[in-house]
Amino acid sequence: KFENNMRAIRTLKTLEKEHRPASPEDQEVLSQYVGWGGIPQAFDERNAAWADENRELKYTLTPEEYEMARASTLNAHYTSPTVIRAIYSAVEQMGFHTGNILEPSCGVGNFFGLLPETMQNSRLYGVELDSITGRIAQYLYPQADIAVTGFEKTDRKDFFDLAIGNVPFGAYKVAD
C-alpha cells in the first residue's frame, strides 16, 4: 500500500508541475492510491521499522499535506466495490437514473468510477477534505466537479438529485 500511495503522489505532483491531464497510464497509477487508513505506522516517527518510509513522506509532501495525511490515518478507509455496487443497485430500484449526483466525501472517486451505465448521463459533483486525495480524484475524473475543501465551506447545497457515498463516521466537530 505504501509504495502504491507514493507512486500515485509522485505522479500527481508530476502532473501538476507539468500542467497536463493524466494519461490512461497515469490514471492507472493514481487509481492505486488507497489513503493512509491501513498504514498509520508510516507516520510514527518512533517506529524504526518505518523510518525510511516516514522520511520519504516528509520529503515528498509539504508540511500541510503531511499533517493532513497523518490525521487521515483514523478515517481514510475507502468503500469496497461490492458495497458501492449494492448502494447503486438500491438507488436504481428506487427509480433514480439521471441527475445531479453529489459524493460529499469522495476520496479518490470510487463512487464515480463505478457509476452504473444507467446513470452515465448524470452530472457528478464531489467534495474531499484531504488535499492529496481530492487532487487525485480530480485527475481520475476530470468530467466531475470536485471541490477540495471541507463540505461546510462549499456552496453545494439544495442542488442535488442524489447524494451518495460512505462518509467517515466519528465524533468530528465542524464549525460553519
Q: What feature does the model see in each segment?
A:
Residues 1-176:
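Class I S-adenosyl-L-methionine-dependent methyltransferase catalytic core
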